[in-house]
Amino acid sequence: MSSNQHQGKLVIFSAPSGAGKTTIVHHLLSKDFKLEFSISACTRAQRPGEVHGKDYYYISLEEFKKSISLDEFVEWEEVYKNNFYGTLKTEVERIWKSGHHVIFDVDVDGGLNLKKAFGERALAVFVMPPSLESLRERLEQRETETPESITRRMGKAPIELQKSVLFDKVILNDDLESAFAKAEEIVGAFLGKK
């Protein structure tokens, strides 16, 4: 990444699947923080209602691996077998060139990798579910998950929860309005808005 880019910052939201990070990120995007969503590239199937180039850049496994070999990612992870997710360098540069700060909605390891790559320019926030039971309920309510994917995600969640201590801030999402307020407070302080 070139050093002459706008001195934008990065706000990273990570959590186990179903903890509410996407809902919080969408809320923050509606506020006056000059944030722009970093669209990740992924190899997973597109879900109903999702839009290529808005929710994700949906690419083939072959294309993803080629981009890895060409060092086109800031970070990438094989989140589940043959389901790769990553942040393209061009995506961060695009947002900074527009004069905005980047906001990420990424898995736990991806969030930690971004924090490591960008250091003090990045704020890493972990969204904590109230319990594993509530996490399972949220995944089941999505109606986009198979029993197998719920089992896989729930198997990964305890390990992800242990990594919460590695983040700059933790938001407990037991009440959505409180989580929104805490997210606004944390992000505002980091960006110098409050």
Segments (PLM) and residue ranges:
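Pre-Walker A (Motif I) flank of P-loop NTPase domains
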Residues: 6-11
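ATP-dependent small-molecule kinase phosphotransfer cores
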Residues: 42-102, 109-112
